[in-house]
Swiss-Prot record:
Protein name: S100P-binding protein
Composition bias, Acidic residues: 28-59
Chief location of this protein within or outside the cell: nucleus
GO CC annotation, single: nuclear speck
Bias (Basic and acidic residues) ranges: 77-86, 162-185, 280-291
Compartment annotation: Nucleus
Subunit structure: Interacts with S100P.
Keywords noted in UniProt: Nucleus, Phosphoprotein
List of residues that carry Phosphoserine: S187
Organism: Homo sapiens (Human)
Tissue specificity note: Expressed in brain, spleen, and lung. Not detected in pancreas or liver. In pancreas, expressed predominantly in islet cells and to a lesser extent in acinar cells, but not expressed in ductal cells. Up-regulated in various pancreatic ductal adenocarcinomas and pancreatic intraepithelial neoplasias. Detected in pancreatic ductal adenocarcinoma cells (at protein level). Not detected in non-neoplastic ductal epithelium (at protein level).
Length: 408
């Protein structure tokens, strides 16, 4: 790779030129402001190599590496531009070199940090040879290198070969899967839909291939699209990316063990039904209107609870208990056993006697919760007292004694 090299003298020489365009000379500078110690090598620039180069040798090496540098140095030798003013020139890339090289301008520096060129100020008439410098330190100090990744056709060939092998493997998988579908009795459309949902088409072979880096995948897909003609490229990159984004879950569900074919068929049917739900053009507004499902008002349904633990009694059983109770009361009246127990005590003793006469499963006479009907299952309607009387007056004779109120 060829890189544009801009010496550090550009920034220093440009900053030292007068603004009014007057000719520049080194004699105009104040010699008291120049420091010869800057020309000496610092600790990091000490010569640590086996070969030392002078400034002329460095210029010759730079001319061999960069033709533009040779052109600029040739103009300097012709006398058009002085060697001290070489820092004010800006190297521009030719149109031929724009594709492979980049040129960077002078490095922005503050006025306090300008570096003086490698010149001697003893005579003040021109530059003199200084101490030989190490080439590596000079290049690191004065040059700005830009590296660009080269285009290697062998890498593209290797990726294309790998893509072809993957596509051949996927084609074999497709043929074997098609035979299995025929054996199971699936129609060709269903098997095709299943394979498309799995992403086992030759165009989507990169999806099932080995996991490469994202840059390699994008590069491989771009190269394969460029090499394939328009007539042989059925789907675009965008459609393939959308298919990949929609079908990874279906791939996993279809690939996992168990009911492989049934789950794959179900997933393919879901994909076909979802793809059929396309936007419908509204004739009135002229806008795209999708399928919308409106839910009506949800009315909660009261769940009726059946009471299975409510004991019900037969009419004969209740009649038997009543007759037993009456006989016990009559016998107690005719022949009382204990007359000093009082009225309440006598009643309690009588009820206990009736309760324990037959068996203890009978309900105690003092318990008034005995019912011979099941509890209502439907919701009871609320009535006012007047409405209830109007509904039940004819069936209950006790309300006949109530006088009729006449409102005048």
């Amino acid at each position: 790779m060829m890189c544009s090299r801009v010496p550090s003298e550009q920034s220093s020489g440009t900053s030292l030129l007068p603004k009014d365009g007057a000719p520049f000379s080194w004699d105009s500078l104040d010699e008291d402001g120049l420091d010869d110690s800057l020309l000496e090598l610092s600790e990091g620039e000490e010569d640590d190599g086996d070969v030392n180069y002078t400034e002329e040798e460095i210029d010759a090496l730079l001319k061999e590496d960069d033709p533009s540098y040779e052109q600029s140095s040739g103009e300097d030798d012709g006398g058009h531009v002085e060697k001290g003013e070489r820092g004010s020139q800006i190297l521009l890339d030719t149109p031929r070199e724009k594709n492979s090289s980049y040129s960077l301008g002078p490095v922005a520096e503050t006025p306090d940090l300008f570096k003086l060129p490698q010149l001697s100020t003893s005579s003040g008439h021109g530059p003199a040879h200084t101490k030989p410098l190490n080439r590596r330190s000079v290049l690191e100090k004065n040059l700005i290198k830009v590296t660009v990744a080269p285009f290697n056709p062998t890498v593209c060939d290797a990726l294309l070969d790998k893509d072809e092998t993957d596509s051949s493997k996927d084609t074999e998988k497709l043929s074997s899967l098609g035979e299995e579908m025929r054996e199971d009795g699936l129609s060709p459309n269903e098997s095709k839909l299943c394979t498309e949902s799995e992403g086992i088409s030759p165009n989507n072979s990169a999806w099932n291939g080995p996991q490469l880096s994202s840059s390699n995948n994008n590069f491989q897909q771009t190269v394969s699209d460029k090499n394939m003609p328009d007539s042989e490229n059925p789907t675009s990159v965008f459609s393939r990316i959308s298919d990949h984004s929609e079908t990874p879950n279906m791939e996993l569900s279809c690939r996992n063990g168990g009911s492989h074919k049934s789950s794959c068929e179900m997933r393919s049917l879901v994909v076909s039904t979802s793809s059929n739900k396309q936007d419908v053009l509204n004739k009135d507004s002229g806008k795209m209107k999708g399928h919308e499902r409106r839910l009506g008002k949800v009315i909660p349904v009261l769940q009726t609870k059946t009471r299975t633990n409510v004991p019900t009694f037969s009419q004969s059983n209740l009649e038997q208990q009543k007759q037993l109770y009456l006989r016990s009361v009559i016998a107690h009246i005719e022949d009382p056993e204990d007359t000093n127990q009082g009225i309440s005590g006598e009643l309690c003793a009588l009820m206990d006697q009736v309760h324990h006469m037959q068996h203890s499963k009978w309900q105690h006479p003092s318990d008034l919760t005995t019912r011979n009907y099941a509890r209502r299952q439907k919701h009871l309607q609320r009535y006012s007292l007047t409405q209830w009387v109007d509904r039940n007056m004819r069936s209950h004779h006790r309300f006949q004694r109530l006088p009729d109120f006449s409102y005048s």
